[in-house]
């Protein structure tokens, strides 16, 4: 597996399928995204990418509110490699990234990673003030011509657990 810091300037030209999320701990919901990105990449001859944060977003917004991470980035990388992920990108959550609009973020992904498929959870939020959501992604997939996969919540005993 290739591990990248997003500050690198490489642009990927192969067809890529990307799972987005904070992946602060790898629970059942995260595993469903990872399985789907791997499956779609293999089925379509592309590469699987997990795009996540180096630091938890709440650590920038309010350090006292930042959750304790269940895995550090090295453990996360080892686990994702065992899951068959081709490329892991770590994004520093900083002021510049935080102020990116939802559309700017998707344009960045399209231009940088040649995205053919985007995999997110049912409650995925992104962009400035979390203004982007799965409904916006449904609109943007038409404009930017990528497949969108929204994973359903994982339930146990009828209750959403992730």
Where are the regions that the model predicts?
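Nucleotidyltransferase catalytic core that binds NTPs
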Residues: 1-162
């Amino acid at each position: 597996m290739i591990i990248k810091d997003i500050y690198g300037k490489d642009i990927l030209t192969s067809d890529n399928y990307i799972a987005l999320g904070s992946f602060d701990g790898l629970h059942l919901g995260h595993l469903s995204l990872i399985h789907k990105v791997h499956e779609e990449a293999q089925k379509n001859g592309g590469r699987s990418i997990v795009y996540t944060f180096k630091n938890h977003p709440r650590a920038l917004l309010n350090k006292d509110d930042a959750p304790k991470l269940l895995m550090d980035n090295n453990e996360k990388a080892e686990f994702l490699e065992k899951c068959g992920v081709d490329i892991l990108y770590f994004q520093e959550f900083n002021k510049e990234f935080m102020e990116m609009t939802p559309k700017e973020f998707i344009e960045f992904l399209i231009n940088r990673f040649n995205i053919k498929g985007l995999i997110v959870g049912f409650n995925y939020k992104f962009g400035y003030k979390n203004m982007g959501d799965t409904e916006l992604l449904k609109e943007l997939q038409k404009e930017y011509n990528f497949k969108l996969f929204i994973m359903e919540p994982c339930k146990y005993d009828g209750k959403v657990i992730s």
